From Swiss-Prot:
It comes from Squalus suckleyi. Keywords: Acetylation, Electron transport, Heme, Iron, Metal-binding, Mitochondrion, Respiratory chain, Transport. Pfam families: Cytochrom_C (PF00034). This is Cytochrome c. It is found in: Mitochondrion intermembrane space. GO terms for molecular function: electron transfer activity; heme binding; metal ion binding. The modification N-acetylglycine is found at residue 2. Heme c binds at residues 15, 18-19, 81. Binds 1 heme c group covalently per subunit. Belongs to the cytochrome c family. InterPro entries: Cyt_c-like_dom, Cyt_c-like_dom_sf, Cyt_c_1A/1B. GO terms for cellular component: mitochondrial intermembrane space. The keyword Methyltransferase does not apply. Electron carrier protein. The oxidized form of the cytochrome c heme group can accept an electron from the heme group of the cytochrome c1 subunit of cytochrome reductase. Cytochrome c then transfers this electron to the cytochrome oxidase complex, the final protein carrier in the mitochondrial electron-transport chain.
Length: 105
């Protein structure tokens, strides 16, 4: 299990430029991640996803996020997310812990 405070730092440094976790917040370049856990890929209402994201058909949970965050373009070829991924396992665990706490619907 990751560290929520460290995960917040990872989010601010590497994710917040394109994403928010604010409940009811507007989408940025990337979708609002509020309510992420339990949602299928490409399903945040009001965000324009690629066909690759819409058709992937997985449900976001701890394990799917762990794999995705390591290398987004490998996990969902055709995604428009330009982020290369988090190579450090500890950073992925921390970020997931933060998202689990803050992005819960």
């Amino acid at each position: 299990m990751g560290d929520v405070e460290k995960g917040k730092k990872v989010f601010v440094q590497k994710c917040a430029q394109c994403h928010t976790v604010e409940n009811g917040g507007k989408h940025k370049t990337g979708p609002n991640l509020s309510g992420l856990f339990g949602r299928k890929t490409g399903q945040a209402q009001g965000f324009s996803y690629t066909d690759a994201n819409k058709s992937k058909g997985i449900t976001w949970q701890q394990e799917t996020l762990r794999i995705y965050l390591e290398n987004p373009k490998k996990y969902i070829p055709g995604t428009k997310m330009i982020f290369a991924g988090l190579k450090k396992k500890s950073e992925r665990q921390d970020l997931i812990a933060y998202l689990k706490k803050t992005a819960a619907s």
